[in-house]
Amino acid sequence: MAASGRGLSRALHSTPCPAWKRVQSGANGCLKPEYDAVVIGAGHNGLVAAAYLQRLGVNTAVFERRHVIGGAAVTEEIIPGFKFSRASYLLSLLRPQIYTDLELKKHGLKLHLRNPYSFTPMLEEGTLSKPPRSLLLGTDVAENQKQISQFSRKDAQAFPRYEEFMKRLVLAIDPLLDAAPVDIAALQHGSLLQRLRALSTLRPLLKAGRTLGAQLPQYYEVLTAPISKVLDQWFESEPLKATLATDAVIGAMTSPHTPGSGYVLLHHVMGSLEGMQGAWSYVQGGMGALSDAIASSATAHGASIFTEKTVAKVQVNSEGRVQGVVLQGGEEVRSRVVLSCASPQVTFLELTPQEWLPGAFVKRISQLDTQSPVTKINVAVDRLPNFQAAPNAPGDQPQAHHQCSIHLNCEDTLLLHQAFEDAKGGLPSQRPMIELCIPSSLDPTLAPTGCHVVSLFTQYTPYTLAGGKVWDEQKKNTYADKVFDCIEAYAPGFKRSVLGRDILTPQDLERIFGLPGGNIFHGAMSLDQLYFARPVPQHSDYRCPVQGLYLCGSGAHPGGGVMGAAGRNAAHIVFRDLKNM
């Protein structure tokens, strides 16, 4: 649907040139034949790795195949006048050290913290001239309890205890995110020096155990059990359980009844922004502004970033060691090391010469679970959605609930499970799980005056439809129409407000952003693909079977989300190895 109609008459402002591009046009903007390090892909992890390496004195170049940096953390003006965080759309998980070390605030990063942060309207008839109920959650404990007590007084009393329980688990796991997993191979078979070094990798794990103490069995259950079982032990009201369960299935082809879904919930509550645990924010200017800030930090110290430069091949010498990359145009760029921010599948099955990779390793990479349930729909509207459960104020000004993640079709965990079952049968969900966000409610720079950008993160849509059918434009639009019908039931008039939309199925997410299977994490965040086993067992320390080749994207430990930890951790491993070469 093309953008048209009201609100688009305002002259469009030209987007200012990001600071990293202004620096890039200088001396470090020319492609050199050799660098110390080459990074494949300017996703946020690749940019973080480059920024750290350059600060450590490692001359680094980043090659990005698209015209824009950021990978999935990108801002694109798909519809004239409307700037969309086209894939990733919220910030919380970015490691605090990265925010500080790279001086991202100095390099232009501005955040809009959300409080309240979650809104779940009910699809029910109002009573006695009152609107339908809704659940609004934020950082105010008393207000949360008041909201929850609409559905269960018992749950209102339990909720603060639940949050404290989860915070302790987050505190335990937090140190594991900022270091490579325990080096089991070195502990078992390494030299004395290697074993001594490997002992240090045990510290975060031991610290986690001490933090959990006698409650370790209960926390183990959170990580391994279905999240529905965990939530049933705490609560009785379905709206609260379903709202919390969305964090356990977001981006995952799993149901709340799937064992291990608890970790994905934990993954989405372990963030911290500006000292606020669990806070989520919109980035001023969209998620691409975060990538621009990281790039600015990198180029300010001398890193080179090139767009529309596709790496076609990792070069390996006759001794089995990396010696650089070959670009799509045939240009050879030599380097001592190569870091890949691309997915494990692209890195090892497409870019790396297969003769240098063990067959067992290639087989494991090819068998990684990359199922994705996600279709992302970016929408331009000429007015705010008007929810029956929380009618708009006169003047159509954003209210507290408009800044939240708005959960639709989430009144009951059974709805989430049924939506999952549809997709397992090869069909788009009849009642999709919808997370609706309106970043322009806090950041008016994203849309023309009076208009808004709406992000719809929807599940569940299979990569391949029943009968082996693929997503064509008709099927995409039919699904989007179904999503809009669902929103219309909660917010009548929504469909009339739509000026344009951008529909990204799992196949689109793979094609445009390089997300394997459309999986936003570069691979499932299931326990069999985490920590020791990410991307595969014995290769969780960012190093690869080819000497000098490293994985630094979301397919490496600790996984997906706009976290930057994989890029930071890999950079430190690379720097240590360079010193020992």
From Swiss-Prot:
GO cellular component terms, A-Z: mitochondrial matrix
Localization terms from the record: Mitochondrion matrix
According to the record, the segments passing through the membrane are: none
Where is coiled-coil annotated?
Answer: none
Give any GO molecular function from the UniProt entry.
Answer: oxidoreductase activity
Protein residues bound to FAD? 38-71
The UniProt record lists the EC number as: 1.-.-.-
Signal sequence region:
none
User: Which Pfam families does the protein's record reference?
Assistant: Amino_oxidase
Keywords noted in UniProt: FAD, Flavoprotein, Mitochondrion, Oxidoreductase
In terms of domain of life, where is this protein from?
Answer: Eukaryota
GO biological process: any one?
mitochondrion organization
Q: How does it assemble?
A: Interacts with COX5B; this interaction may contribute to localize PYROXD2 to the inner face of the inner mitochondrial membrane.
Function noted in UniProt: Probable oxidoreductase that may play a role as regulator of mitochondrial function.
Q: Which family does it belong to?
A: Belongs to the carotenoid/retinoid oxidoreductase family.
The protein in question is named: Pyridine nucleotide-disulfide oxidoreductase domain-containing protein 2
Q: Which organism is it from?
A: Rattus norvegicus (Rat)
- This chain is encoded by the gene named Pyroxd2
